[in-house]
Amino acid sequence: MIQIAGITGNPDMKIQKRALVPMCADNGVVEEGVTQTGQEVTAIVAENFLSGDTSACVMSRQCGTKVIPVDIGMAVDTKVSKELKVAYGTANMTKGPAMTRAQAVQALEAGIEMVRRLKEEGYGLLATGEMGIGNTTTSSAVASVLLDRSV
């Protein structure tokens, strides 16, 4: 709290509303067989965020945090809000770019929009997360580029 008070310049800082915002999307690289489960698991877990049936939800409840999943790119539509959906999954990165530059910008802007909305709703502390089968493979690829290391 001391750090947050310092950042905000408010020594009487009180955080009344907190949210965890998992951004849910499917990864086209799954078609390469890089995962233990199928892509359909992304939608199942995303809907479980809504019903509170995930470990992230259990931990969030313990600290009074609301879980607000966002469909930013799942391959199918679910009960999760798709208002900010960029695409129905990404392309297979082994065959070409997973996303266009415009899609990448749109995805970043979707995150910015969620922060804006939640701030307007009075949320004082936000955490983000992700859910998408194949995400370890895509994260490894990003880390490889950023760290200039082979996978």
Q: Which role does the model predict for each range below?
A:
Residues 1-151:
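N-terminal loops that bind phosphate or other acidic moieties
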